[in-house]
Amino acid sequence: MDENLPVIRISVRNLVEFILREGDIDNRTGGGPDPENMQMGSRIHRKIQRQMGSDYQAEVPLKTEIACDGFTLKIEGRADGLIHTKEQVMVDEIKGVLRELDRVQEPAGIHLAQAKCYASMVAEQEGLDEIGVQMTYCQMETEEVKRFQYSYQSNELKAWFDEVIRQYEKWAKFQIEWRKARNASIKGIEFPFPYRKGQRDLAVSVYRTILRKKKLFIQAPTGVGKTISTVFPAVKAVGEELGEKIFYLTAKTITRTVAEQAFETLREQNLKFKVITLTAKEKICFCEETSCNPDDCPYAKGHFDRVNDAVYELLMQEDVMSREVLEAQARKHKVCPFEMALDVSTWVDGVICDYNYVFDPDARLRRFFTEGGAGGYLFLIDEAHNLVERGRQMYSAELCKEDFLAVKKLVKGEAPRFAKRLEACNKILLAMKKECENYKVLDNISHFGIQLMNVLSETDRYLEECVDKEVRETVLDFYFQVRSFLNIYDGLDENYVVYTEYQENGRFVLKLFCVNPAANLQKCLDKGNSAVFFSATLLPIQYYKRLLSTEKDNYAVYIDSSFDTKKRLLMNGVDVSTRYTMRSREMYQRYATYIFRVVKAKMGNYLIFFPSYRFMEDVYQEFTQLLASDEEEMELVIQQKHMDEEERENFLRAFEMGREKSLIGFGVLGGIFSEGIDLTNEKLIGTLIIGTGLPQVCNEREILKSYFDQKGLYGFDYAYRYPGMNKVLQAAGRVIRTEDDRGVILLLDERFQKEKGKEIFPKEWADCERCRLDIVEEKIRLFWEKQTDN
């Protein structure tokens, strides 16, 4: 082999799953949790291997190198077993399944193909004329085993394997040629703008972090240009082969657009860099209902027969894989746009997507994040303050007692064994319910886990035969809940609290609550080379470092604001409070008067954020009465509890329109309008934040408080103060978005004056002034007069 030639590596499993797939997408059976990725699956593998005797060699690493046109293809894998007897050498491939073995009439084509690849590699290494393949299927619940044996002539097997490799060669060649062109283009790009204050330091910090394969936490205020300052050094690093692929991860759709624009800006310098933006299945699906099977969806029928051609053509023609481009290609080739997009993501240089495609155990891109060791991935994690709560959600799971009874009622007539399994779980939940008053923390639920595994097996069997569409959908939804619960249960550790509680609607739930998501997030981060967490509100940074990664030597940088603080007025109203003991009509009237006087001081657009809908409605009522008794004209818009996309757009559109009177938007702190919206210049000149943002007391928050207290940390801060302050910082950040913006930020709660509140203020809030209701209007008038003078 020519050592100077570039090398393309691929696993045997990925090779056969990609080249040899065929047929339809069909989600009508659960398919089971992947037993290969579960601890139970691994245990069964080891148990079978131990039982096989002295002529059985377990976990045999295999690899072969093939000289291709201009590159070397290295194919690697690990056979579950290799059996050497006097009569024959045989490769053993073990697969755990949930369904009954009498339903396994023959090995799955992909499973057998994987074993045949291993067999061909062994036959070539050992110079064999003939070799056997044994497919071992083990039923996960009963541990019953069923085997299929085959014998192959080595020359025939090699011809088959060579054909698989030949089909893959064009894909490997594309990788080599594109990488060469891409890296050459990266050498020529420069930072596309004059550096703002702190921006060069930020970009250098990102590059050094990638170079050293570390993690970096960035606290950088609005206006620094975080997106281009992270994307540019990451692209440069890819060009220097410090990483293979950039994952730009976001919590909201709007920030994906900003990332797309950053890559597009670099393309103006002739950068060659293929980037895909992934859209949720429900949004990109062509059908009215997302029903992924060949009977309901024409794009699912024969999808795997056509998708590789669709992907290859797209790679040859496009560098920007936007939603519109993906939809057009999917329609042209009559394939599922979502599944095609996931395939395209394998081949591109950058993936812009939601957090869940990397971190969520139910949604992550398995092709990157489940098999094998680390890839050369660079994670750029935007608005990273969101990842704590999102992480808790992704790694937690719950089951409701009432759902077991509902499914039992549906199936008991035709599936008594299934109903019996459901009832066994229901009895355990009933016993838990009798011991629970409000909520109850549990030490051990292993007895429930065993019964739940039985339910999963029976659900899988039931779905194979169920023909009633409505019943199937209900049972399938239940199946996914159980599967998700078991996957989380399989990884329970000291970062979890298991508890039961009654929900507000009276339903009784058992919850696996991930109180600290750091360890789970770290497992995903370990699949990459480096990660950069950035946000305008990553304060206090030690809190986020502790909850987003388990590593102790992560870097952190604090970038100073580039904005002129003279262009904004920051005040704290110290004569009001949202404490429960202080809430009264008189206090609501006081808040209403604050709003009125601030807006009266300067006509324009304002957002007012409240701690809850109830509080907002009470103050809104007082404000409308105040407005009715005055000649001042103001237009009001108010956030509703459940707003569809059109209603959200209408709310924001009101701020885009010119008018001859003030506009006041009433919203909820931590809601859809207090984060991620960009209202520049005159579109927003003031924000009033009512309350400290503390989450409402609930079981979950109290569990967090107790957990972190026991860890020797300040539980109240972790459960309440830090999440609350983040909401305040985000809401305040809506006002000054560009260096030309001017505006007022008013924090309305006396508790901001306490040391605990002030110590987590950002540096640029050092000029926060105290104010009272009787002087607020005068202070604001003076501020705006100074702006006019300037």
Predicted regions, residues:
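Conserved pre-motif I regulatory segment
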Residues: I176-Q219
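Walker A/P-loop
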Residues: L211-P233
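Mg2+/Mn2+-dependent nuclease catalytic core
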Residues: T64-K158
